Amino acid sequence: MSNKKNSEILDQLLFGHNLDDETSRVLMKRWLNNEILDVQTGAFLSALRAKGATGMELSCMAEELLNACKLPIDRPDLFMVDTCGTGGDGSNTFNISTAVAFVASACGVNIAKHGNKSASGKVGSADVLSNLGINLNSSLDKVISAIDDIGITFLFAPIWHKSLIKLAPLRKALGIRTIFNQLGPLVNPLRPNAQVLGVASEDLLTPMASALNKMGMDRAIVVHGYGGLDEASLEGDNKIIFVDNGQLKHSILNVSDFNFQNTSNNDLIVSNNQSYENILESVLKGSGQKAHIDVVALNTSLVLWVAGIEKDIEKGFEKALFSMSKAKPWDKFLSLKAYLET
């Protein structure tokens, strides 16, 4: 194990030098073991943000977090997909990736959705699901078995990564995106086989895709949406990296290449007289605004691709629309709610 002092590692970061495998792991272990003072943590997080975390740093730190997270029962022998992204795009859109999780599950994908409450002003996935009656504190056994019995589950991050709870107030006080925003989507305790991961900044595309690849993800799409969304947008060019069996491929996704209607990102913003919960419910029931339903269908089509269910984006889009038109995603939601109640 590296015997570098915390101050030496901090100096390395402040000079813009990347951390090697061992030092990245040591830094995370020290966080987990409460061996870093709060003032040092603030400095580390700021230095890492200024330098920019590499795929190697992210994958090594994520693996240490996962090693510290023990499952109470065996991982289900299923091909699972997560839709957790970095968040923090500041767009005040409704919870698109949360809606996508239920729609994709209704289309036959086993969804292991990892999420948290908001660290900013926006309502996080855990906030909206809790407000709609999902029990975030269900037994861990139940949370895991739900994906086998229902086809979807929700893993509330603080329940699984308790050692990081003490960092939450400091992260909030800093008021900036930190490396933990990037680590969140990488540390799903069920270690899904595939993922659609939205990033709030274009410069996160390559390190996040590289981290997923280094961690052995079978298939993934990392997407930075037009206008700064951390989801695929219906308005313009979406920058994408496909991760497929060890290979990374950069691409551009624009709805003008398909038979989709162009829609402004502004139509996805939650206004003062709307609630995140009502929008999510209406989308899952297929009764929501067309812009909301269409953007969920677009992003669901990406999930269907990584899951190997639908290779054609347009067909995936139509499959998602059909599912919502029959309110099947809402049925999935109600099933999960009932399952986790006890």
Curated annotation (Swiss-Prot):
Catalyzed reactions per annotation: N-(5-phospho-beta-D-ribosyl)anthranilate + diphosphate = 5-phospho-alpha-D-ribose 1-diphosphate + anthranilate
Annotated Mg(2+) 1 binding sites: S97, E231
Residue sites binding Mg(2+) 2 per the record: D230, E231
Known pathway: Amino-acid biosynthesis; L-tryptophan biosynthesis; L-tryptophan from chorismate: step 2/5
Positions annotated to bind 5-phospho-alpha-D-ribose 1-diphosphate: 85, 88-89, 93, 95-98, 113-121, 125
GO cellular-component term (any): cytosol
EC number assigned by the record: 2.4.2.18
Chain residues that bind anthranilate 1: G85, N116
Cofactor dependence: Mg(2+)
Transmembrane segments: none
Function noted in UniProt: Catalyzes the transfer of the phosphoribosyl group of 5-phosphorylribose-1-pyrophosphate (PRPP) to anthranilate to yield N-(5'-phosphoribosyl)-anthranilate (PRA).
Protein name, per record: Anthranilate phosphoribosyltransferase
Gene source species: Prochlorococcus marinus (strain MIT 9515)
Name of the gene this protein is made from: trpD
